[in-house]
Amino acid sequence: MRQFTGVDKLIHSFDQALRSLVPGATAAHRDNPSVAEKTQLAVSEARHVAGLMRVNHSGEVCAQALYHGQALTAKLPNVRREMEQAAIEEQDHLAWCEDRLKELDSHTSLLNPIWYGLSFGMGALAGIAGDKYSLGFVAETERQVSLHLEDHIRQLPEQDERSRKILVQMNEDELHHRDTALNAGGVDLPVPVRIAMTGISKLMTKTSYYI
């Protein structure tokens, strides 16, 4: 069986980054859950929903980068497989959010390359720190993402079932990823790390909503 060199891994990482950042480059592996009939939204409602979905798309870009960075540096093969499988499932979220943004005549965040780079670096560092911390980083990330999704679900216009079905399914997946990481040996992160993660998350949500 061929062993991948460091250059091979870097090329693979670059390919993954392009697939995460280039609009339309990511295809979902599962059907889009937004099977509800299209509903008419007021201009202000559509603008707000687009902002929320843009934030959620950026969050999934961050998750992709996190998993890619961790898979590059994780020490145990089973942990690398967990990271790679989670990244595949997160691709569905990317595609679903992008589809909904297109339906709303909107766009993904122009800041996504920045969020990807930051998250990739954090994921790689977590992997270097050790698999238990890497998995703990995943669990904390998914916990924070779930909180954002639950808040966004509450903010959706009552009639917007298409966006709601997407976010509900995404939230179920995020909670599953959190539980999987904890069951695989993830540990609680130090409080300063969790606070820093929350601060970065708030910056991402506030800027990606508009840009």
Residue ranges and their predicted role:
Residues 1-211:
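Non-heme di-metal
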